[in-house]
């Protein structure tokens, strides 16, 4: 899959459909759903940068990332929304018996999400789920916290631990164990599917204001990510653009 350099991250040039098809056909692959926060943290932290760049797909989830790809490389890149990747992957795999495992979040969110998924996709095959305790990504990669995930051997493992913890967990998991499942860091998607949080309307996301919608819902947690990191993203992008 082709990719382009944005800040210091190699972002895949792809679509929602292509990522979903990739997850259906491949094994033992890793996918990071990247927004401006991902790229800023990777720019400032070489350890995170190297881990993210090792993923097989780095999908441009955020509007700023997709727009930057268009401006820098004159391509037709659109947002690869993690929420849409999640649903499209499930839809594409229904008739082939594709199996899914959910790792992260909490029991309330997971149970509500599974209820909603079973209503939307009555034939969905859920291999299992695990809601881990609050531990570091390194501790969570210990066998007692991943044994069920490994034993169930689902086609896709969806990981919702928040960035960068979920990506660091996936990296550690691949490094320590022989895993044939595809591993996808999916952020807040579990909560959106469970409807414990409200996802921004499509038109809001398409004009680049999804971050405002989310900031209003969680100002304390997301203040730094959206107000500081978004500003830094613009600065770093301008620097890259002027250096062309």
Task: Go through the PLM ranges and name each one.
Residues 114, 167-176:
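Short Gly/Thr/Asp-enriched flexible loops that form oxyanion-binding sites at enzyme active sites
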Residues 132-137, 179-217:
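Short, flexible loop segments at boundaries between secondary-structure elements
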Residues 65-67, 165, 189-193:
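Short gly/pro/ser/thr-enriched loop/turn and capping motifs at secondary-structure boundaries
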Residues 35-39, 161-166, 189:
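Short glycine-rich anion-binding loops that position phosphate/pyrophosphate groups of nucleotides
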Residues 1-84:
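N-terminal nucleotide/polyanion-binding subdomain common to many enzyme families
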Residues 149, 153-163:
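Proline-aspartate-enriched helix->loop->beta-strand connector
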Residues 70-148, 152:
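Conserved beta-alpha
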